[in-house]
Structures are given as structure tokens and as C-alpha cells.
Amino acid sequence: MLAVVSCVGALLNGVPAPGFAPLAHVDPSIGQDMRYAGPHNFTGAVVDGYEEPVCLLARPAARALARAQREVLRRGYSLLVYDCYRPQRAVDRFVRWASDGAERSTKAEFYPRVEKDRLIPEGYIAERSGHSRGSTVDVTLTDLRREPLDMGTPFDFFDPLAHTDDPRVTGPAREHRDLLRSALAAQGFVNLPEEWWHFTYKPEAFPDTYFDFPVSVAAVRP
């Protein structure tokens, strides 16, 4: 989710690209629980730039995710996304939150074993995110009733236990992580090893552009 990415050649662009689409218009069967559009996230509040609880992605990434969903459904599961395109203003909000030592209301759920002042130095929070380029998605597996499966940790858990291949994760959680990774890898998604939920579609449609338009259906050009 919050990997450090190069800002060389980055363009902070407040105008949406015509190559974005709401995921629901591409595959409405994929579940959406857009965490930063509500208070259930590590900041404890709606995050700047999230005007609607919708997933927006560059079109090639959205189509690839739909292909992965077909395979996951065939296996008796479904995909659920937590975050997709993320405006730069949201990333800036994360950095401000991480720098506010007084606000610790979400520590027990999201970062119980790391001090808040270590979140930036240890790479959990960064000044740039691949999500702002539009081809990265935070995603998990659910059963067909849309109940999330055991993945070993919650989403956005700032801890080495969230590393995709952490050896302490065994049994069903290990099987679920491996299934998620293999299904997405087959469609061109690359996992971030430090976060089991974080995948980037390659090649990216906008590899050098960090967008800042708000998350809303109206912000995406037809």
C-alpha cells in the first residue's frame, strides 16, 4: 500500500486522465470496501480526496483485475478491494498523520508493535505511493457471501507479519495468500512483498505520473 516509489519525473496532476474507469463499470461482481472513504482506517477518519467510496483504476488494470476475478470465482471465492487509485493529497494526509505523535487512537488495530514515530523511517508511510499512478490495488479474498477470508493479518497492518511470505503465516491464511498472489500474477499483477494485499499491474499505463484528482465517478472522463 505505502511503498516508497521514485519521484523522478513525477507529475502532480490535478486533471484526471481519460484512461481511468470505475471498477464497477468493468466488473460489478468485485466487492468494494473503500477504507479511506470512511473512518475505518489507520487515520481514524475520511481521508482527503476520497469524495465517494468507489474504486477507480487505469483501464488496463481494471480489465486485468476482472480477468483475475473470473479465476477466483471459478475457485469458489471472490475479490474485495480496499483501495485503488489514491490521490496525492491523500498520501500527503498520511504523512501529516504519521507526524502527529498525539493521535494514537488506532494503534491497537493497525500498528500495535511499532511506535508511530517509526512508521515513516521503517517505510510503512511514504511521501509518494504507486496508487497515485492508477494501476495499484489493495485487494483480498472473500467467500461468495462477501465475508473476508483469513489472510493472517488485517488490511493495513503495519507489521512484518503482513509480509506476503512471512513464515509465521500458515494453514488457511497461507493458502489464501498464495491463491490471491497466483491469481493476480497470472494476469500481470506484481505483489509488494511487504504487504500481502498490495498489487500493481504491469506495464503501468501511467508509470511516471502521480495524479491528484479526487476519488469520484464524476472525476473520471468518459
Regions found by a protein language model. Give the residues of each.
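Extracytoplasmic cell-surface/polysaccharide-interacting catalytic and binding patches
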Residues: 11-84, 89-194, 203-222
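Secretory targeting and sorting signals
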Residues: 1-11
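Conserved metal-phosphate-binding beta-hairpin within the catalytic cores
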Residues: 199
